[in-house]
From Swiss-Prot:
It comes from the Viruses. The gene is 59. It comes from Mycobacterium phage D29 (Mycobacteriophage D29). This is Gene 59 protein. Pfam families: Endonuclease_7. SUPFAM superfamilies: His-Me finger endonucleases (SSF54060).
Length: 165
């Protein structure tokens, strides 16, 4: 007799059918009781996803009201006013992850909606210093290296530039 035959069933092999309950939302809606609630939750997978999304939305609305003093309707009005995109980069649209509410840390005034990258790494890193951001614009428009050594293409970019032409 092999080792497997002598082994008693472990906890992973238990029959949990007796512990399953019908989904409470399916029962409330009068749906046929074919979908079991996953142990230990009271809802089937479909209703669990719906409940989780609703709870997430409600907690988000509560958080932006408490943190920034704006309602969900005001958030979406700003979103529409900005064209449904991050105001700085115009790339992020908030479909996968909602845009962040940006505010001035000195005055507390809500300024608009930005993606995480722009809010955290552009404005956050610059600490809202207009002079620093202006220097960055000047740097991009008139690079100091071009003024000193002239336009010189970096070897790591040369192959890419040749293949594009």
């Amino acid at each position: 007799m092999g080792r497997a035959a002598k082994r008693t069933p472990g906890y992973r092999v238990q029959n949990r059918k007796h512990k399953r309950k019908p989904c409470k939302d399916c029962v409330a809606q009068g749906l046929p009781l074919t979908r079991d609630a996953k142990y230990p939750g009271p809802r089937c997978a479909t209703h669990h996803r719906e409940f989780k999304a609703a709870r997430s939305s409600t907690s988000w609305e509560t958080r932006i009201l408490a943190t920034y003093g704006i309602t969900a309707e005001e958030y979406w009005a700003i979103y529409e006013f900005q064209g449904g995109r991050c105001y700085i980069c115009q790339r992020a649209n908030g479909k996968r992850k909602r845009l962040s509410v940006d505010h001035d840390h000195k005055t507390g005034i809500v300024r608009g909606l930005l993606c995480t990258m722009c809010n955290k790494y552009i404005l956050g890193w610059a600490r809202d210093c207009i002079e620093m951001l202006q220097r960055a614009i000047d740097y991009l428009r008139k690079p100091p290296a071009v003024q000193v050594i002239g336009e010189r293409i970096a070897p790591i970019e040369a192959d890419k530039l040749r293949s594009q032409t």
